[in-house]
Regions:
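Aromatic/hydrophobic pocket-lining residues that form π-stacking "cages" and hydrophobic walls in ligand
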Residues: 23, 68, 96, 130
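Hydrophobic alpha-helical membrane-association signature
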Residues: 19, 61-64, 126
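Structural beta-alpha unit
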Residues: 1, 70-108
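Acidic, proline/glycine-rich short linear motifs
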Residues: 38-67, 91, 95-98
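Small/aliphatic-rich secondary-structure junction motif
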Residues: 2-50, 71-81
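Feature marks short, surface-exposed loop/turn motifs that line or immediately flank catalytic pockets
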Residues: 42-43, 87, 116
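Gly/Ser-rich helix-loop-strand patches that form or flank binding pockets
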Residues: 25, 101-144
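Residue-level recognition of beta-strand->loop/alpha-helix junctions
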Residues: 38, 83-85, 142
Length: 144
């Protein structure tokens, strides 16, 4: 299958860097456009200043995107970056799928930590949520 629009989601982890590198290679091989996104999670706690928290989380997200941008730039990939909307932590996978639909992505690339058992139950899995919700093919990149 030939992909023209590949979207990769990053969170700054080593696993997301692996996903980015795989997405870059795929985009170059397929001569596809690459979109690198980071979804800003709403981790609002009742005792904190919400506006300040939003500003901090957006700045952190932009820093992650800037780091990923440098990796993509060094590879001479055709790419763009996008800081996706502020969403509750339980809805990150929904936001990723919505971003993919809005951008008309042919493929979503996402890293997975491969957790299982109790830690998977506690932490959940954004990747698993994306697989369940996406109508677009999803490529999972597992951490080494």
């Amino acid at each position: 299958m030939l992909y023209k629009r590949i979207m990769v989601t990053v969170d700054g982890s080593n696993t997301s860097i692996l996903a980015l590198k795989e997405a870059i290679q795929l985009a170059k091989d397929q001569k596809a456009k690459l979109r690198i996104i980071h979804v800003v999670e709403d981790l609002y706690e009742g005792d904190t200043d919400r506006d300040m928290l939003i500003a901090v989380r957006k700045a952190e997200g932009q820093k992650i995107l800037n780091e990923m941008k440098e990796i993509a730039r060094q590879s001479n990939a055709d790419f763009e970056t996008h800081l996706a909307g502020f969403t509750s932590s339980g809805r990150v996978s929904e936001q990723i799928v919505a971003e993919a639909k809005a951008w008309h992505a042919d493929l979503i690339v996402i890293g997975t930590h491969g957790r299982h058992g109790f830690s998977h139950i506690l932490l959940g899995s954004v990747a698993e949520g994306v697989i369940r919700l996406a109508t677009t093919p999803v490529l999972l990149i597992r951490s080494k």
